[in-house]
Structure formats: C-alpha cells, structure tokens
UniProtKB/Swiss-Prot annotation:
Keywords: Amphibian defense peptide, Antimicrobial, Secreted
Protein's name according to its UniProt entry: Caerulein precursor fragment R7
Known tissue expression: Expressed by the skin glands.
Subcellular location: Secreted
Similarity comment: Belongs to the gastrin/cholecystokinin family.
UniProt key word Secreted: yes
GO CC, any one term: extracellular region
GO BP annotations, alphabetical order: defense response
Function statement: Antimicrobial peptide.
Membrane-spanning residues: none
First-listed, main subcellular location of the protein, grouped into a coarse class: secreted
Amino acid sequence: GLASFLGKALKAGLKIGAHLLGGAPQQ
C-alpha cells in the first residue's frame, strides 16, 4: 500500500543522503 511505498522511499532517501554525506554504516 501507500504506507509501504512511503516507508521504502524514506529508507532509500536516508541511505542516499547518508551516502552523499560521506558513507553510512552498512546494516
């Protein structure tokens, strides 16, 4: 559903943002 899509988008956004900031810990 929409909530699932938003959740995935949020996680992807955080991952991309962290990568742009200099790399995030791999989880």
